[in-house]
Structure formats: C-alpha cells, structure tokens
Amino acid sequence: MRIIFMGTPDFAVPSLKAIAAMDGDFEVQLVVTGKDKPRRSKRSEPEPTPVKKAARELGIPVMEVDDVKDERFVDTVARYRPDVLVVAAFRILPPAVYEQARLGAFNLHASILPRYRGAAPVNWAIINGERESGVTTFFLRKSVDTGNMILQEKTPVYPEENAGELAARLAEIGAGAVVKTLELIRDGRVEPLLQNDTLATRAPKLSTENTRIDWVQPVDALCDFIRGLAPRPAAWAIFNHKKVKIFKASVADFHQPEAEEQSAIPGRIAVENNRLFVMGLDGWIEILSLQMEGKKVMQSHEFCCGFRCDEECPVFS
C-alpha cells in the first residue's frame, strides 16, 4: 500500500513512526509538512517541523508545502499514485489533493467526533470540563471534520491534566488508531459511520480574545480554563497594566472574610504566606505557576516575594 503522510506538529509524529514500523504491506513514499520556521537569530538555520525531523530520521522523502492548492503540489501527489493519504494535524486539503488516493484519504482528529470539530479540540474539551476525550479517524470530505468515521478510541481526561499532557497521550493513542485504520482499509473491512450533525460542537481556533480569563466564573471553570490552555498559548490576564500568563492553578480552601465582605470582586488578589490566591465567582483559586510580561516563567512564591501593586485593591483583570 502506497501511502503519503501529511502532518506538521508533535501530535503527528507518533502516527508517522507507527506507520513506518508496519509490515511490508505499507510504505510511506512521501511525507508532506509545513515550511521550516525562521529562528530568532538571523544567523541560525530555520527550524524544521517535528514531522520533518522524524521523516529525516526514518529516511523518508519530505516535501514542504506552503499552499496546498498550488497545482505543482497537486501534480506531485498525483505522480506518487498513492493508495491512501494519511493526514494528522495538517492543513485543510482541497478535493483535488485528497481525491488522488485510490483507496481513500483519512484524517486523525483529537476528539470523539462529532464533538469538538475544529482547530483546537483538546483545549476546548478541557476548558469545558469534559471527563472523556479520544481520537477519531474519518474519511476526508470538503466540509471540515464532517466525513464518515472509521474508528474511535476513547480515554479519560485526568483531573489535573493540562492540554499539552492530554495531547501527548492522544498522539500515542492516535498512532494506534491510524495503524488499525490502515489495516481495515487494506483488508476491505471498513464500515464507515455517518456523523450525527445534531450532536456536533465546535472547537474554534485559539486567539488573544478567547484565551483571556473571565474571572466572573465558578472556581472549577477557572481552573479548567487555565489547564485547557496550558502550556501554550496559556490563559492570560492583566496585572499592573501588563499581561500575565497563568499556567497552573487549583481550587483553594481559602477565605479572607474582610476582602469577601468589603470587596467581593472576581479577580481580586490575596497574598498569604507566599501563596497567591485569586477570587472567582464562588470562592478562590490558588495560582501555582505564571509569567509576567517580559519575564521568565515563575512559581507563585517567587511572584509573591516581589509582589507590588499600584492599586489599593489588587486585581487580575
């Protein structure tokens, strides 16, 4: 089976390696990935994508693509005469590309479809307090993340797990699902399942606007929001007119009666015994790890040691 693999970030690497380790019935003829990223230093070589690095180690030819609609790219895919296209965390492909695959093109998506269709399924699952996540393989179609499903694998979302940790686990689970999917296609045993669009939910791309913390939330929701965006891009707020990223927090058994009675303002800060607390809608959370604008990531006790505020009632806004 001739395979073209398409992917860019770390999430896609376990799947590529798993396919490369399969028996002789499966051959990855080409890996397609994004362009190298420029480094901060102009003298340094551009940074290859994680998938490109893995493909080089495996000795598989690599093609970097900027525009998936470019006719030269479409022609290249056609010349390889692929039986299957495997896509994991790549771009939205036009039909002219994925229809080249004789037996079909499928995508690995990090959610239990039809829930969390979109660019950031892992993040939004945690933000919304889901207790279960997983992966789905499905055949590509023009409408994004709506194709007929092939295989699903489910896993719990652990209470303290952040988005980066869950994504790493799903990448490994997904690699197994990709292998099983290829075997089903080879053996002609695929039984595609239609998605129920009435159950669909969205997982939109993360932005500056939708990653800012709204402190007028229950404390459980605040902690879910923070871990759902950790370690990247990170939930953020404003303190002393500067941006602060918050990476880790927990619900706190903390009370400050005077503050709660006089200034029950969500976002209010309290420092006690070098611990940093922030008021939510129904209690307090403890901030454990954060980063002030222009500074390195620090633990909360480091922040508390140098705590200064321009306001009488300090708040994260």
UniProtKB/Swiss-Prot annotation:
Pfam name, any one: Formyl_trans_N
Keyword annotations of the record: Protein biosynthesis, Transferase
Entry similarity comment: Belongs to the Fmt family.
Binding site for (6S)-5,6,7,8-tetrahydrofolate: S111, I112, L113, P114
SUPFAM superfamilies recorded: FMT C-terminal domain-like, Formyltransferase
Phylogenetic classification of the source organism: Bacteria, Pseudomonadati, Chlorobiota, Chlorobiia, Chlorobiales
Catalytic activity, EC: 2.1.2.9
Protein biosynthesis as UniProt keyword: yes
Catalytic activity: L-methionyl-tRNA(fMet) + (6R)-10-formyltetrahydrofolate = N-formyl-L-methionyl-tRNA(fMet) + (6S)-5,6,7,8-tetrahydrofolate + H(+)
NCBIfam families: fmt
Name of the molecule in the record: Methionyl-tRNA formyltransferase
Role according to the record: Attaches a formyl group to the free amino group of methionyl-tRNA(fMet). The formyl group appears to play a dual role in the initiator identity of N-formylmethionyl-tRNA by promoting its recognition by IF2 and preventing the misappropriation of this tRNA by the elongation apparatus.
Gene: fmt
Protein source organism: Prosthecochloris aestuarii (strain DSM 271 / SK 413)
Primary enzyme class: transferase
A GO cellular-component term linked to this record: cytosol
Disulphide bond pairs: none
InterPro entries in alphabetical order: Fmt, Formyl_trans_C, Formyl_transf_N, Formyl_transf_N_sf, Formyl_transferase-like_C_sf, Met-tRNA-FMT_C, Met-tRNA-FMT_N
GO MF annotation list: methionyl-tRNA formyltransferase activity
